[in-house]
Amino acid sequence: MKYKITGNENQIFNNNAFFCVGTGRMGLALQKHYIEQLKFVQDELGFEYIRGHGLFSDDMAIFQERKYGEDAEPVIEYNWTYLDMVMDSYKELKIKPFIELGFMPKKLASGEQTIFYWKGNTTPPKDYQKWADLIKATLNHLIDRYGREEVLTWPVEVWNEPNLKGFWKDADMEEYFKLYQVSAKAVKEVDENFKVGGPAVCGGSDKEWVKAFLEFVSKNKCPLDFVTRHHYTTEFPAWDGHYGYPKLHPKEKCFEQLEATRGIVDSFDEFKGFDIHVTEYNTSYIPNAPVHDTNLNAAYIANMLSTFGDNHKSYSYWTFGDIFEEGGVPFTPFHGGFGLVANGLIPKPTFWTFAFYKKLTKDFEKCVLRTPECVVVKTKNNTYKGIAWNVDERFTGNKITLDLEFPLPTTDNVLITQLVDEETCNPQKVWHDIGEPANPSKDQVKLIQQGANPLTSTKRCDNKLHLELKSNGVCYFEIKNAPIKSDTGFTFGRYE
């Protein structure tokens, strides 16, 4: 593939990759290793928002109902201790909550159904007024502690994947609509300037749910500021022991399940053009899929990020780290967790995909090239930066070549590349080669970390780039004019 860039191009490229990132349940933020992983991610990637389950689950201890005396009436109390600890940590790490209202406190729940190792209750409230009061009390407390102006910038999403029976009892659509109506009204009663949305559905019955949800909202004049849904790009997994092995959708069809949502939203005059937030996405939807830890995942996500912003206000990678307990505590550091970072502060290949996209944001002026294999931007100081990828989901071994010509002088340029592929940056392979230790020693972790960094190269060059990418490689490149300004008497390469 050959492309000549003139510098006058201006192509569509909405790089919203850093608006939000996912997390395991909120109570995990009380753990030391969780905070270390989030700091590691924030220092390099700097996400703006974080979204996860479990705000109202019992481990956060917010909703309390008890009797003070044998014959006394039950008293409802709210305990903000853990909530403040979590939010203070987020504030310190310069990340805001994308608030998900869920799951149900046990003493407010209408049933016993739970989900996950940590048993989040997924039944409707037995008293919708108490549920509304809980929402209002929580938001008012956050405003009191962090300030109205700040907290009003925190979006609010009602529940999580109610179209799945595990996440919402019987996947009862009408009951969810009631939950949404009550919840959204409660949010707006605190302050009309809060932004609230839903229905947070996943694939499968998503078309039916989104359409019916918007019809309900329209008919009942419910508050709605944005639409949310989730997106994963694999089929049902084949199970083997602790692991699931799903088949990836072809890269050309990675957004096929999403395409209908924009059309459904825009078919309603009152919702046309509404923001769509994809509040979860990844390749696989299970937390024990080895693909998450691989170079294939990095290349596949690189391809997705180049066009994800075309029709979506934001898209939240699920998740930033591997302190995560939906299926239980993992046995090994490379257990196929969702995270960008493996336990032990080991960046996975997909971490670098995000790091490369972050580099494109600095001094960004415009996009000058976007193809199925690369994206190139021009900066305000006339530097050209780009990312190229070679998604090979069937492991054919095919290589791709990329030849680019830039509107730069033909001499005195520097080319900087950072390469992530199965040979140069593959921490899972390092872990495999040293025997797949379930609990690696400090020295072993250090070795794996050393194998988890891109191969960085520099060279003097003309105004052309020739790049070869192996299977599932991702490469960041940067080319700019950089004349040599040697100190008096210094000659590079001279030793005598």
Regions of interest found by a model, annotated:
Residues 10-28, 32, 54-55, 161-162, ...:
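Cell-envelope and extracellular/periplasmic
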Residues 1-47, 471, 482-496:
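Mature N-terminal, pre-catalytic/accessory segment of carbohydrate-active enzymes
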Residues 37, 234-289, 311-322:
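Glycoside hydrolase catalytic-domain groove-lining segments
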Residues 7, 28-42, 141, 207-217, ...:
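Short, acidic/polar
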Residues 409-465, 489-490:
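Acidic, Ser/Thr/Pro-rich beta/coil linker or hinge segments at domain junctions
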Residues 45-249, 286:
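Substrate-binding cleft and catalytic face of glycoside hydrolase catalytic domains
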Residues 371-433, 471-478, 483-486:
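Carbohydrate-binding surface patches
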Residues 277-397:
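Aromatic/acidic polysaccharide-binding cleft in carbohydrate-active enzymes
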